[in-house]
Structure formats: C-alpha cells, structure tokens
C-alpha cells in the first residue's frame, strides 16, 4: 500500500535566549565591588543555593549604580526577547521583574528547581572562573531538564522521545533567558574563585488604567 510523504511538525517548542552585553567587563568589575560590600552586611537567603550566598530579591530596587545599570539592561533584554517571541502582545500587559545575586564559592551549587508564577527566568553571568582541574568542563554549568515526559526505556536507548537535558556554561557578560517552567540546576563550582551571577524572574501584569 502506497502512502504520502510524512509531514513532520514540531509542537510545544521551548524558546531559549542568549544575549551578550557588549563591553561588559567594566560593568562586571563595578558589580563585583558592590556585591562584596553587600555580602559583608547581609546574611543572605536559603533558596535553591547550596553553600552559596543568595541576596534579597531586590535587584530592581537597589540604589547602587552598577546594580541599577544592570537592572536597566535586563529590562531592555527581556523586553526585546518578549517582542521577538510575541510581537502581537496586548498593549495593556507589562512586565514586572525581581532579581537577586548568587555568589557560589568552591563546591557551591544550586539544586534542581523552577520558578512558578513567572513568565521568563534568566541569569546574567558576572564572573565565571575556570575549574582548578582544566579537564573539568562542567564546573558551574547550568543544566536544563527536558520538561516533556519520556518513553520508559530505562536509559537503554536514545530516541527523539527520550527525556533529555541541555547544559551550557556561558562566559561572563552573557545573559540567558528561558520560560520559568523549565526545571534547571547548577553544577558545583570547582574553582577556588567565587562564581558570581545575577538571577531574575519576569512576569506579566495588567497596566493600570
């Protein structure tokens, strides 16, 4: 029996955005100085972080110049990504943001988690030190877990339907952006230097009339 050529469509794709801030080195140096001062004064929070320092969720309200500058950059980057993904978004919707600092010393990591209640989640990379062991390419990498269910093959056979993962280790000055439902975790920092990132969530709200 003859049949037509199969017509394949991809459904339920997950957008993943990478943006690099141009000439970020000077901004990152100022951020590191401001963050160090905050660490001396603030005890930090316990969230998905293991052994690291997690600031309050107040990035977008901070008075420090570099914090404020980065907050503005994040607003613009999230807005640009949203416009590209959803150009016909209703005009009465606006994005509200929250953000925080993560400082991860040696062996610190972030346990698997997602960010319910938001639309976008993201991370900006301030300092990404190399592992003390040059052969360790996973130090401080962020790993995303395929949100789809998978066929129960017990890991014996890789197929397009097998639950997968995506791992990336961005350079300093890079911002990653993904849908907040996407579960992820951060590999342990295997460097003697602190790894420093800025994480954030963005959600929609109706603009006041």
Model-identified regions with their sequence ranges:
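A short beta-turn/loop motif at secondary-structure boundaries
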Residues: 91-94, 190-192
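Short helix-to-loop capping/linker segments positioned immediately adjacent to catalytic or ligand/cofactor-binding
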Residues: 62-65, 85-89, 108-112, 130-133, ...
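Solvent-exposed residues in well-ordered beta-strands and their adjoining turns
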Residues: 20-22, 104, 125-127, 201-205
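Non-heme Fe(II)/2-oxoglutarate
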Residues: 2-88, 109
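Short clusters of hydrophobic/aromatic residues that line enzyme substrate/ligand-binding pockets
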Residues: 53, 142, 186
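Short hydrophobic/aromatic beta-strand or adjacent loop that forms the aromatic wall/cage
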Residues: 14-16, 121, 195
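Catalytic core of non-heme Fe(II) oxygenases with the double-stranded beta-helix
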Residues: 95-175
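Catalytic core of Fe(II)/2-oxoglutarate
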Residues: 157-209
């Amino acid at each position: 029996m003859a049949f037509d050529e199969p017509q394949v469509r991809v459904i339920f794709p997950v957008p993943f955005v990478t943006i690099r801030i141009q000439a970020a080195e000077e901004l990152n140096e100022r951020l590191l100085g401001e963050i160090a001062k905050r660490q001396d004064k603030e005890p930090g929070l316990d969230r998905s972080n293991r052994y690291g320092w997690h600031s309050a969720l107040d990035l977008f309200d901070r008075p420090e110049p570099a914090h404020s500058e980065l907050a503005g950059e994040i607003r613009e980057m999230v807005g640009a990504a949203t416009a590209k993904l959803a150009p016909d978004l209703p005009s009465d919707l606006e994005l509200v943001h929250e953000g925080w600092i993560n400082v991860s010393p040696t062996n610190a990591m972030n346990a698997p988690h997602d960010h319910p209640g938001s639309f976008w989640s993201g991370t900006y990379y301030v300092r990404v030190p190399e592992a003390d062991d040059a052969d360790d390419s996973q130090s401080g990498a962020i790993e995303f877990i395929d949100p789809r269910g998978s066929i129960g093959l017990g890991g014996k056979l890789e197929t397009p339907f097998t639950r997968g993962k995506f791992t990336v280790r961005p350079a300093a000055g890079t911002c990653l952006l993904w849908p907040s439902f996407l579960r992820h975790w951060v590999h342990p920092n295997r460097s003697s230097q602190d790894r420093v990132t800025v994480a954030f969530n963005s959600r929609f709200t109706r603009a006041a009339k």
